[in-house]
Every structure is written in C-alpha cells, then in structure tokens.
C-alpha cells in the first residue's frame, strides 16, 4: 500500500498552521512577575529580563541599541538599553519585578531610573556585585 503524497496547497497550509501555532504561544505568555538583571561595566551595560525561574524573556545592551566604542559606557546608553529591554515585557503584562544590579559602571543609576519610569512596581533592588574576600592578586598598577 503506497502512501498518497499530499498536494502542494495542503503542505503549505499545514506549514502555515504549524508556524502560526508557534508564534501564538510566544505572544500569549503572560508574565506577572520577573527579575531584571542590570550588568554595568565601565565599557557597556547589559539589561536582561527573566521570569522568576530564570528563563530569559528579553535582553538588550548599549551595543545592540546602536552605540559604539566609548559611548556604550555612558549613562544615556544604559538608559536606552534598559528601556529597550523592558518595553516588550510590559506589553506581555509584567507588573512587578525585582532588580539585581551588578558591576561598577556609570549606567547603574541611569538604568534603574529607566526601569522606574516604565511603570513596573519594584519589589526590591539588590546589589549583587561580586566582592572578593581577599581572593586573587589584582593586576599591577598601570604606569603611564
């Protein structure tokens, strides 16, 4: 018994239905609470939004927002990156979030200001910058 080959039109409809199912599942996911990670170095700022379990929902950095070279480390670049990462999450219905800030960069406060302005209620703001308890020897001092 030979299998019948489906027509081209039927194959196209099946493929479209499969793609529509994938897309719809992504957009209908409601996330009421999440965690916003801000990693601010002197050269760049990366903002990642995750759900409570740690799965990444959206992310952005100063580099992906179009800033290059030394401009990536500026507070304005951090503010733009934070707004860019939070916009799709607010559309998905996030109302409350916890903020975790890591690093010594200039973009720490600017990113936090942008998060506050987005309308998400912040349950807590935590500084998770790693500090050594006299661990590795630091590099030698720079002589210019």
From Swiss-Prot:
Keywords: Chloroplast, Plastid, Ribonucleoprotein, Ribosomal protein, RNA-binding, rRNA-binding. One of its GO terms (cellular component) is chloroplast. The keyword Chloroplast applies. It comes from the Eukaryota. GO terms for biological process: translation. The keyword Membrane does not apply. NCBIfam families: PRK05309.1, uS11_bact. Its main location: plastid. This is Small ribosomal subunit protein uS11c. One of its GO terms (molecular function) is rRNA binding. InterPro entries: Ribosomal_uS11, Ribosomal_uS11_bac-type, Ribosomal_uS11_CS, Ribosomal_uS11_sf. Gene3D superfamilies: Ribosomal protein S11. It comes from Oenothera argillicola. It is found in: Plastid, Chloroplast. Part of the 30S ribosomal subunit. Belongs to the universal ribosomal protein uS11 family. Pfam families: Ribosomal_S11.
């Amino acid at each position: 018994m030979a299998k019948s080959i489906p027509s081209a039109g039927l194959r196209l409809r099946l493929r479209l239905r499969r793609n529509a199912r994938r897309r719809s599942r992504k957009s209908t996911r409601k996330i009421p609470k999440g965690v916003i990670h801000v990693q601010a170095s002197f050269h760049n700022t990366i903002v990642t939004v995750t759900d409570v379990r740690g799965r990444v929902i959206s992310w952005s950095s100063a580099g992906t927002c179009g800033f290059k070279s030394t401009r990536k480390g500026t507070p304005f670049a951090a503010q733009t990156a934070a707004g860019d990462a939070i916009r799709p999450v607010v559309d998905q219905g996030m109302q409350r979030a916890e903020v975790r800030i890591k690093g010594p960069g200039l973009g720490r406060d600017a990113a936090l200001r942008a998060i506050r302005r987005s309308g998400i209620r912040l349950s807590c703001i935590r500084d998770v910058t790693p500090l050594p308890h006299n661990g590795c020897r630091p590099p030698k001092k720079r002589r210019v």
